């Protein structure tokens, strides 16, 4: 069962721009020690668009090795090319991932029927559980609850969604079309409280890269019904949720992690490091959360 605080892992790079495997192994180990309940490598936060296919596969392999069964690994395996997505999912299955995260095809804007056919092809090609990643702001298309419901009913291995629509009511709508056992995970940290209140069971989080223990405690509080603690942690984390997204992409999270000494503040072009004004706001949010002095 995928539940709680799953981290959308950053991919550390050396100053030369190469994948920093040593830092990544240590980072995954730290995440597990801090209470993270699931690991999601090579998604958007892992800078998958700028990884080669060989690098993509290597990051997945390393993550699975380090996890060693201690937490589920949900391997990013999305593409706007159906055949390519199938290949990535099949590799994830061969490597020993526990599930695959498959994003809705971006840029080429398929219809709802096209979305159905894309995910149907992926589902037929693997036995891995598949989590649909619905993120309209980046993909420019939105999988409707009815389409998701058809997929969930037609394919037993389409088991859940990472929902980054920003519409918390979708949880209820998707429960009606997909069934009460369909796994619904928030794709937005700031609204995860409301998402879980509607029946969600966790979050694939960016902030948990930086504050894994707090995010894990927050998810546990929401899912156990401890509203007092959940609100306390929400207020503690909200400035950080907002600050690390003041600039697009993973730039904010990598800056914050560099402050903690976990990774180098290195991104691959076209992403760039945050502006000084943004860095100051992230610093303030980290202090508010109690992560730095």
From Swiss-Prot:
Which residues participate directly in catalysis?
Answer: 133, 162
Keywords, alphabetical: Amino-acid biosynthesis, Cytoplasm, Diaminopimelate biosynthesis, Lyase, Lysine biosynthesis, Schiff base
UniProt pathway annotation: Amino-acid biosynthesis; L-lysine biosynthesis via DAP pathway; (S)-tetrahydrodipicolinate from L-aspartate: step 3/4
Its primary localisation, in coarse terms, equals cytoplasm
Q: Which PROSITE patterns match?
A: DHDPS_1, DHDPS_2
Which cell locations does it reside in? Answer: Cytoplasm
Which N-terminal residues, if any, form the signal peptide? none
| An example molecular function term from Gene Ontology annotations | 4-hydroxy-tetrahydrodipicolinate synthase activity
| Site residues by UniProt (Part of a proton relay during catalysis) | 44, 107
Keyword Lipid biosynthesis belongs to the record:
no
| GO terms under biological process | diaminopimelate biosynthetic process; lysine biosynthetic process via diaminopimelate
State the InterPro entries in the record.
Answer: Aldolase_TIM (IPR013785), DapA (IPR005263), DapA-like (IPR002220), Schiff_base-form_aldolases_AS (IPR020625), Schiff_base-form_aldolases_CS (IPR020624)
The cross-references to PANTHER family, in alphabetical order and at most eight, read: 4-HYDROXY-2-OXOGLUTARATE ALDOLASE, MITOCHONDRIAL, DIHYDRODIPICOLINATE SYNTHASE
Q: Which NCBIfam families match?
A: dapA
- This chain belongs to the protein called 4-hydroxy-tetrahydrodipicolinate synthase
Phylogenetic lineage: Bacteria, Pseudomonadati, Pseudomonadota, Alphaproteobacteria, Hyphomicrobiales
Q: Which gene encodes it?
A: dapA
């Amino acid at each position: 069962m995928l539940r709680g605080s799953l981290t959308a892992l950053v991919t550390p790079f050396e100053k030369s721009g190469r994948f920093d495997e040593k830092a990544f192994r240590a980072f995954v180990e730290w995440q597990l020690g801090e209470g993270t309940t699931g690991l999601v490598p090579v998604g958007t936060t892992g800078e998958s668009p700028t990884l080669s296919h060989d690098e993509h596969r290597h990051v997945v392999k390393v993550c699975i090795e380090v996890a060693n069964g201690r937490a589920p690994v949900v391997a990013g395996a999305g593409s706007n090319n159906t055949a390519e997505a199938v290949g990535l999912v099949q590799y994830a299955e061969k490597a020993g991932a526990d599930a695959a995260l498959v994003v809705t095809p971006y840029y080429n804007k398929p219809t709802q029927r096209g979305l159905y056919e894309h995910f149907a092809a992926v589902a037929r090609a693997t036995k891995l559980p598949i989590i649909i990643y619905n993120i309209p702001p980046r993909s420019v298309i939105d999988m409707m609850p009815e389409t998701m419901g058809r997929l969930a009913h037609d394919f037993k291995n389409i088991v859940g969604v990472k929902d980054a629509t920003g519409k918390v009511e979708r949880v209820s709508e998707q429960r009606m079309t997909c069934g009460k056992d369909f796994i619904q995970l928030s794709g937005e940290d700031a609204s995860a409280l409301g998402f879980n209140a509607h029946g969600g069971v966790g979050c694939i989080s960016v902030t948990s890269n930086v504050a894994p223990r707090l995010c894990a405690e927050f998810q546990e509080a929401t899912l156990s019904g401890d509203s007092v603690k959940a609100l306390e942690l929400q207020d503690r984390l909200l400035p950080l949720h907002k600050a690390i997204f003041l600039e697009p992409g993973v730039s904010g999270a990598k800056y914050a992690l560099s402050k903690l000494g976990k990774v180098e503040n290195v991104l691959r072009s076209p992403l760039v490091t945050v502006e000084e004004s943004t860095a100051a706001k992230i610093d303030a949010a980290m202090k508010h959360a109690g992560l730095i002095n």
